[in-house]
């Protein structure tokens, strides 16, 4: 899977994403026998001079938003995720966002050796979310929500003045503790069990 990521003007970010952002669908049901549910999840990706911008739009059952702090257990909520790797690096970065715009951000070489980003770096990650408070009980029925995350290139070890030709990435939708757990991806994953920490299955974003 590949995408060409356009450079956009930040003066009107919403319109620029809608008109110019590269469209993607998070629609690969990689483990249909055990986790068949597939909420609708799509988005647009673009870049500014110094950041990657990813805008997610979701519609599905079991709206859950209980993690109210950064670097929590965001994957248990209704959650969208961006995993990124500069091909020249041995590590990759994961950014996991719930509907409140609260982010889990870590770096490391594999699933078992993740290091959370410090608080002073978390404030550099811009988020735009429609919801701003915890949902104590999961909302039933189909719910729609949107969240946009702006990830500075310096937080993924990339010099914005000398961008690589491409980076590797995958986009995910999950909800481990929702009534219908699901594990969707943009670029397909070929493993027996759900595992998003597989950079060998990342797609490519051309910058």
Model-predicted regions and their roles:
Residues 1-207:
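Structural preference for beta-rich elements and adjacent junctions enriched in aromatics
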């Amino acid at each position: 899977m590949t995408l060409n990521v356009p450079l956009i003007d930040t003066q009107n970010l919403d319109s620029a994403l809608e008109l110019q952002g590269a469209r993607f669908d998070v629609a690969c049901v990689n483990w249909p026998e055990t986790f068949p549910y597939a909420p609708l999840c799509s988005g647009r990706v673009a870049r500014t001079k110094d950041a990657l911008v990813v805008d997610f739009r979701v519609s599905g059952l079991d709206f859950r938003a209980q993690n109210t702090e950064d670097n929590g257990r965001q994957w248990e909520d209704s959650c969208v995720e961006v995993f990124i790797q500069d091909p020249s690096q041995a590590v990759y970065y994961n950014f996991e966002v719930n509907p409140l715009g609260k982010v889990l951000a870590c770096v490391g070489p594999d699933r078992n050796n993740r290091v959370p980003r410090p608080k002073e770096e978390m404030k550099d990650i811009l988020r735009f979310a429609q919801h701003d408070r915890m949902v104590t009980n999961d909302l039933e029925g189909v719910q729609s929500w949107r969240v946009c995350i702006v990830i500075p290139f310096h937080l993924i070890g990339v010099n914005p003045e000398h961008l690589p030709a491409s980076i590797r990435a995958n986009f995910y939708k999950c909800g481990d503790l929702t009534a219908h757990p699901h594990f969707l991806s943009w670029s397909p994953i070929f493993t027996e069990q759900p595992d998003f920490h597989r950079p060998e299955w990342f797609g490519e974003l051309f910058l």
